[in-house]
């Protein structure tokens, strides 16, 4: 069931589905591993409703569970123009001494503008230039600022727009995985949010290898697919790192007959980017704009753990590429009917 033959798989409209708004999780589950887990067998299309803690039943000794250890930076700032008008700045990535940022309302923030981080303090962010994407700006903090301290003290966790509330203190913990350690993302790799230290320890004691890689989630996560022919979509570049020991463990897993289980679409895109059919997994760091949709030949992964994704998103298309479009959409209908919780703070799906 993996490869659907008809042309509908390339139509954007195929990837829209009906989602009652009350199923969009606004807060995380009380306990990380108390989420639900929908298991989809991509060969048969069979579905199984489980608890997330049951994931270890689908892993075996010698498998590799691959985690993205990126950390979300508190990169959202609410600032003020000299007129007192409120604006929003989301830092995306460092550009030398400056930052690439997404600003709104963009029409009010032209090159040369200055904004203040509070109405009564003279802490300045300068808009240096306009960039080549909607709302994109190069911005610069005034010289004397310790940026790390500023991020921690005044930055907000950049919750996705479908979470209809301000960020709270709990988000500083719960919108990070328990293994997040390398700062650089503007959105969490959400499939990993369900793991606890105890569950990871239990999985390790089963003889499963835990492999850690990095992909910093960036602009691409906010970029909707707009082309009706999804093959025309382009992804933004995102930074990744695969260390020598991680590549070696992945290659050893394959050579030993183990399966590679990707925790999240970010891991899939990274592993598919560094896999070479002649040499296996290659260590390295760089940027990838790997775009995966139905018809793609997967080479690097055997199973995929992921959350439920937005209608019409490139992430949903990646899942459909792995599981088959019809099976994926049927799983989503099942999830809606059975009141699963959707998106970043929602439940998980395991494709086997």
Swiss-Prot record:
SUPFAM superfamilies: QueA-like. Keywords: Cytoplasm, Queuosine biosynthesis, S-adenosyl-L-methionine, Transferase. The keyword DNA-binding does not apply. GO terms for cellular component: cytoplasm. Its EC number is 2.4.99.17. PANTHER family: S-ADENOSYLMETHIONINE:TRNA RIBOSYLTRANSFERASE-ISOMERASE. Monomer. HAMAP family: QueA (MF_00113). Transfers and isomerizes the ribose moiety from AdoMet to the 7-aminomethyl group of 7-deazaguanine (preQ1-tRNA) to give epoxyqueuosine (oQ-tRNA). Belongs to the QueA family. This is S-adenosylmethionine:tRNA ribosyltransferase-isomerase. It comes from Syntrophomonas wolfei subsp. wolfei (strain DSM 2245B / Goettingen). The gene is queA.
């Amino acid at each position: 069931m993996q490869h659907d033959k008809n042309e509908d798989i390339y139509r954007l409209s195929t990837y829209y589905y009906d989602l009652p708004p009350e199923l969009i999780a606004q807060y995380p589950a009380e306990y990380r591993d108390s989420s639900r887990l929908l298991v989809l067998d991509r060969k048969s299309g069979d579905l199984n409703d489980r608890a997330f803690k049951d994931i270890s039943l689908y892993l075996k000794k010698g498998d590799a569970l691959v985690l993205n250890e990126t950390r979300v930076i508190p990169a959202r700032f609410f600032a003020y123009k000299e007129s007192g008008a409120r604006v929003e700045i989301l830092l995306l990535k460092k550009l030398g001494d400056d930052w690439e940022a997404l600003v709104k309302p963009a029409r009010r923030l032209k090159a040369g503008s200055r904004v203040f981080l509070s109405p009564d303090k003279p802490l300045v962010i300068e808009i240096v230039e306009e960039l080549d994407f909607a709302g994109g700006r190069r911005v610069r903090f005034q010289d004397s600022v310790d940026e790390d301290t500023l991020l921690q003290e005044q930055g907000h966790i950049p919750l996705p727009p479908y979470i209809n509330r301000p960020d709270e203190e709990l988000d500083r913990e719960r919108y990070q995985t328990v293994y997040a350690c390398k700062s650089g993302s503007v959105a969490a790799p959400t499939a990993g949010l369900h793991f606890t230290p105890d569950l990871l320890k239990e999985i390790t004691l089963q003889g499963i290898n835990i492999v850690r890689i990095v992909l910093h989630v960036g602009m691409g996560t906010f970029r909707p697919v707009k082309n009706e022919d999804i093959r025309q979509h382009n992804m933004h570049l995102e930074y990744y790192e695969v260390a020598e020991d991680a590549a070696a463990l992945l290659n050893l897993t394959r050579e030993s007959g183990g399966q590679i289980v990707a925790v999240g679409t970010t891991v899939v895109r990274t592993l598919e980017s560094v896999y070479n059919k002649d040499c296996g997994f290659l260590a390295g760091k760089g940027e990838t704009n790997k775009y995966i949709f139905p018809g793609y030949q997967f080479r690097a992964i055997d199973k995929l753990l992921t959350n439920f994704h937005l209608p019409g998103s490139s992430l949903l298309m990646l899942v459909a590429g792995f599981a088959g479009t019809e099976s994926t959409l049927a799983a989503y209908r099942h999830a809606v009917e059975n009141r699963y919780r959707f998106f970043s703070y929602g439940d998980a799906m395991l494709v086997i």
